[in-house]
């Protein structure tokens, strides 16, 4: 619970005025609850006294009854108004706090390294951002507020009962202590079971996301029974843990019923004896039993709310665990923002590791402004790791990567990444229109600039042939478009961004020859005059570069212009000809 309270503290603090107002009316509601039985007590004592004097109906007694009835109406109305205001105030606090926490958590997750996202399933992270925060908000309003009101009511009622009759009040205190003892142990067990349940729900979400995200493969290979079995297994685990927590909560509620029943019976018998002995009036007994009933209701409610709050606490711990992850890569305190970026990139004795495994070993490489360098070599040799260093998706374990003479870890991270356009093998588009996806490169771009970028990327023709043109809505991750179309839209986005550095990571891999040719033409437009690093297994893409760097086992093995390497390196020539025997037969024979 303390961890959850620390988590929401920064988000709840700006709502202090609402919380103060809500607390004030909550206290007023408790006062009205304390006052509510008094008209009934006075009425009973007045009637007993009147009946003891005579059997007639005294006018003053009738007027007193009317006044007491009106007083009760005022008290009930006041309590209702205060309850309404407190509910609204704390509902606003809960909603605003949850929205702030969700936004803060999403911003935090976006700033975590790619290694974090590779290690953690995205569906579980989404579950923490949405479902767990929602549960915290719901329980805070529907259980936290009533429990706070009940706790205040319980404390005030116990104090009042001690003043009314200390002996009978001891019975109530014993009942409260018995409840606290029963609650403390059960709360821990409910929290533990709820935490396991939330983890199981996260696994359930992961299983569903993986199956639906790869539905083409699932259906093509007939994997539906296998994945259904996995989903059912995860669903069963989630169900059993949820039932376990609710069973413990139900046990606590029934134990509380027994405690309340015993306390009520003892007070009823003991109070009746004290009335017969003249130690208290009938009105006092009614007042005391009313307070007892009012006091026991919070105990029953606390038993009911304890389980819900324990489950919310488990959700809070999951969100807190997520927020406790420290970003691996951050801007320095005195970050530098360059007035102008020329695009000189220098790797000086760079070593790098991924997931603890060494990948690069002492790489030295300089890319001059406007130069196009292709990085080739076997898979897993460190090419993608090398270009990841340029935008600080990863930091070297030793050595320095610099831009225009400044070490990257001296530069403002947001500024650094704004200076590079990155195209990956899978061009991911966001749900929305084609125009909106291109405009992500520069949100303030006009429609004319968006169209000009699409023309330069050789995307305008196929876009205008679509029913909605630039306003055609693409599906999730651009699934309604072909790979080549998605890549050309991504290139248009990069052209609109107009950054001095371009990074192409397997941008043509997996495309058919026609799409590859169209994408390569668009890439030529993109890289012109820009510092470019291209990771590729495609000789067509490599031969368009100014320089080719062969990386193997994390080290640079070959380096030179494509033409020089074709002439001087049998290894490079074999690689090129084996990939494009027909296209490069003429080039190879000329070496």
Model-derived segments and spans:
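Cytosolic ends of transmembrane helices, especially the final helix of ABC transmembrane type-1 domains
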Residues: 223, 247, 294-322
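An intracellular "coupling" helix at the cytosolic face of ABC transporter transmembrane type-1 domains
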Residues: 13-14, 114-118, 131-140, 144, ...
